[in-house]
């Protein structure tokens, strides 16, 4: 494979020296970009965009044409796995993702098959290899998946949920059934991420979007235990390089110490954590990724730069920090403001790496 021209993202994740703090944005290929909206209109709908490797490659690269980002992230959706398990993913306008079939009984769980990455999710593997080829070593490519708990919530609720009442009821009424579902999902995520790594992903991130909605005890049992299982089964070296793993539990700031023991190289932080405090707590074990509040991008450029400067100062000197937002960039953000953010990270962080 082509040698990387810019590897500071991978180096920071492995706590190796860097010249400036690397930066990328969750959902950097997304609706805030007019070129993304044009591609989506051309594709017809969101699923057609995801399932066509050429379109997925096109939108993955769009933010890199605009901004000096230090990583690309595969354009896909976390719900590709349940879709490949036969649940029938579709998107309702204004409603978000829905499933034609819902998991409600132990028999439904027993019937689920673990998808084969090549046969059942081949369009994702093709997208990864296409993007990797088109990047031509410019920056590393991140692969990703949802966490078992987060995927389970969509499968049991039938889509997005405010309170996860069905999934949480299952956790307390029938924990054996939920554990069977989570175990199948952990196996599926492991093979899916390993498929992405073999296809060319140079780092992987597990998005545990809804783990932070659990109690502390339930988080350990129903979310973290399964992410730990996945991490232990991942390919950690490929193509002559280490493949770093990032775990991101939104609203997981209370549990950083136990997440840091899960075996990943880095933890993603949402904006409710103070990154300097997180570094003092777990920085000896893992790198940190984050964690500006995405809504800061609605503020004036000077305010964006000030907040970048504050977060950099909070983290302090040395490597082990990948700058990111604390969650995905939102559709109404002015693309110019995203550019201010990315340039500020590079410009203002050099002093911390001398």
Swiss-Prot record:
InterPro entries: UROD/MetE-like_sf, Uroporphyrinogen_deCO2ase_HemE, Uroporphyrinogen_deCOase. It is found in: Cytoplasm. Substrate binds at residues 27-31, 77, 154, 209, 327. GO terms for cellular component: cytosol. Pathway: Porphyrin-containing compound metabolism; protoporphyrin-IX biosynthesis; coproporphyrinogen-III from 5-aminolevulinate: step 4/4. CDD domains: URO-D. It holds the Pfam family URO-D. Catalyzes the decarboxylation of four acetate groups of uroporphyrinogen-III to yield coproporphyrinogen-III. Homodimer. This is Uroporphyrinogen decarboxylase. It comes from Pseudomonas putida (strain W619).
């Amino acid at each position: 494979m082509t040698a990387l021209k810019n590897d500071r993202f991978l180096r920071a994740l492995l706590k190796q020296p860097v010249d400036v703090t690397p930066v990328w944005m969750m959902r950097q290929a997304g609706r805030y970009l007019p070129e993304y909206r044009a591609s989506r209109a051309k594709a017809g709908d969101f699923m057609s965009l995801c399932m066509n490797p050429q379109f997925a490659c096109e939108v993955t690269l769009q933010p890199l044409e605009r901004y000096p980002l230090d990583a690309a992230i595969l354009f896909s959706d976390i719900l590709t796995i349940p879709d490949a398990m036969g649940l029938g993913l579709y998107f309702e306008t204004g409603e978000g993702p829905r499933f034609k079939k819902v998991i409600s009984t132990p028999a439904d769980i027993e019937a689920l098959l673990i998808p084969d990455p090549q046969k059942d999710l081949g369009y994702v593997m093709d997208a990864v290899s296409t993007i990797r080829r088109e990047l031509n070593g410019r920056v590393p490519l991140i692969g990703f998946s949802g966490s078992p708990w987060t995927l389970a919530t969509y499968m049991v609720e039938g889509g997005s949920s405010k309170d996860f009442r069905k999934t949480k009821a299952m956790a307390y009424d029938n924990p054996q059934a939920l554990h069977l579902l989570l175990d199948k999902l952990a196996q599926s995520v492991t093979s899916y991420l390993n498929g992405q790594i073999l296809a060319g992903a140079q780092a992987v991130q597990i998005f545990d979007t809804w783990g932070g909605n659990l109690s502390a005890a339930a988080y350990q049992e129903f979310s973290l235990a399964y992410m730990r299982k996945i991490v232990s089964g991942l390919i950690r070296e490929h193509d002559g390089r280490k493949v770093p793993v990032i775990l991101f539990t939104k609203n997981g700031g209370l549990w950083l110490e136990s997440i840091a023991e899960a075996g990943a190289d880095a933890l993603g932080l949402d904006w409710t954590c103070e990154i300097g405090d997180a570094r003092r707590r777990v920085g000896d074990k893992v790198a940190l990724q984050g964690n500006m509040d995405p809504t800061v991008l609605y503020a004036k450029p000077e305010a964006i730069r000030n907040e970048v400067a504050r977060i950099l100062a909070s983290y302090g000197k040395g490597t082990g920090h990948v700058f990111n937002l604390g969650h995905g960039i939102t559709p109404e953000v002015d693309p110019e403001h995203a550019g201010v953010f990315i340039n500020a990270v590079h410009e203002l962080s050099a002093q911390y790496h001398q």
